[in-house]
Amino acid sequence: VLSINAGHWIQGDHGHDRKDVGATIETFIETFRNTGKSKRPALILKTSGATFSTVQYNDIYKRIRNITDKYRVEIPNIYVIEGSFSTDEMNALYNHKKVKAMVSFTHGEGYGRPLAEFCITQKPVIASNWSGQKDFLTHSVKLPGSMKEVHHSAANNMILKESKWFYVDYGYASKIMKDVFK
């Protein structure tokens, strides 16, 4: 397993959710879809909501299928882990010998606790070069990108449509994922 993306996959069209999970999945697939099956990494998508619900679970799988169904070739496996984990469970996941790195394309509006926790493993972190995580991701790959207006599908009472979010350079992110996988 090359990477973990820890976060919420909530409001916002593809590529416009707070954590940019859809674009992370698509970039991962584009990066490794032509890799031989025996050498192809997998993606672990760790999500959590307020509580577990079948509706949320089905929504996550629908979002993934909306991305994966357009590919007519074999693609890397995507494993979904849903729910709240204890500190020990997250530690075991982060430190699992098959987990090689964490990837986060978050648009950046906070500290990035999962990124801070993952740093303790001393494994690579590939993350947006924006927001609170810049303070502690000193030995990680900070992805370049640009500021763009928040997409109307993500705007709500907390995220104003006049706001701007950071969008990573997906081509550069793909190159870095390949380098980390080698």
Predicted feature locations:
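Conserved catalytic-core segment of nucleotide-activated headgroup transferases in glycan assembly
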Residues: 1-89
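Short glycine/proline-rich turn/loop motifs
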Residues: 5-12, 99, 153-162
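Short catalytic/ligand-binding loop motif for oxyanion handling, primarily in non-cytosolic enzymes
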Residues: 10-15, 51-55, 111-112, 133-136, ...
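Nucleotide-sugar-dependent
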Residues: 15, 105-112, 134-135, 156-164
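Short alpha-helical segment that forms part of, or immediately flanks, the ligand-binding pocket
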Residues: 91, 116-123, 131-135
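Acidic donor-binding loop of glycosyltransferase active sites
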Residues: 92-110, 120-123
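C-terminal "capping" alpha-helix adjacent to the active site of nucleotide-linked donor transferases
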Residues: 147-182
